[in-house]
A protein has these predicted regions:
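Helix-start/capping segments and mature chain N-termini
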Residues: 1-144
């Protein structure tokens, strides 16, 4: 985790220096998480979601890049009746989270195994799997 927020979160940027530095500190990390003051906003090139007490928690739109895949996942979750809470998940909530995942156009919906040294209790848990299924179904329906 990096204790900073992207300066202009609504703009897709190629300024990856802070994320590069963060990944150098943890060679096993696939992405760096932006965590200003302990609030998880997004990762270096993906949107971030955490499942806490059965609710999907993700940063409010005004704090992050509102990517296409992020919008799709939020819409699919709400259409399926899943609770989506628009607030920044906290680093302090990681130990009690059930799942976490990142999204992106290429990554689609990718489970998170750990945040820093803290392991996520369920890697590719039921909510992540359900959203992956809903997304695959939406693509299949579109192609028919």
């Amino acid at each position: 985790p990096i204790d900073m927020e992207r300066p202009f979160p609504h703009i897709k940027s190629i300024f990856y220096l802070p994320a590069y530095i963060g990944r150098r500190q943890d060679k096993e990390a696939m992405e760096a998480l932006y965590c200003p003051a302990g609030e998880i906003t997004e990762s270096s090139s993906s949107s971030f979601f955490m499942v806490i007490d059965g609710k999907i928690v993700t940063a409010p739109t005004e704090r992050v890049l509102d990517g296409v895949m992020r919008q799709i996942v939020i819409k699919l979750a709400r259409e399926a009746g899943l609770a989506v809470e628009m607030r920044c998940p906290l680093l302090s909530e990681v130990p009690r989270s059930q799942e976490a995942f990142i999204t992106g156009s290429i990554k689609e919906i990718l489970p998170v195994r750990r945040i820093g040294s803290q392991r996520i209790s369920q890697v590719n848990g039921p909510i992540s799997q359900y959203l992956q299924h809903l997304y695959a179904q939406r693509i299949e329906d579109y192609l028919e």
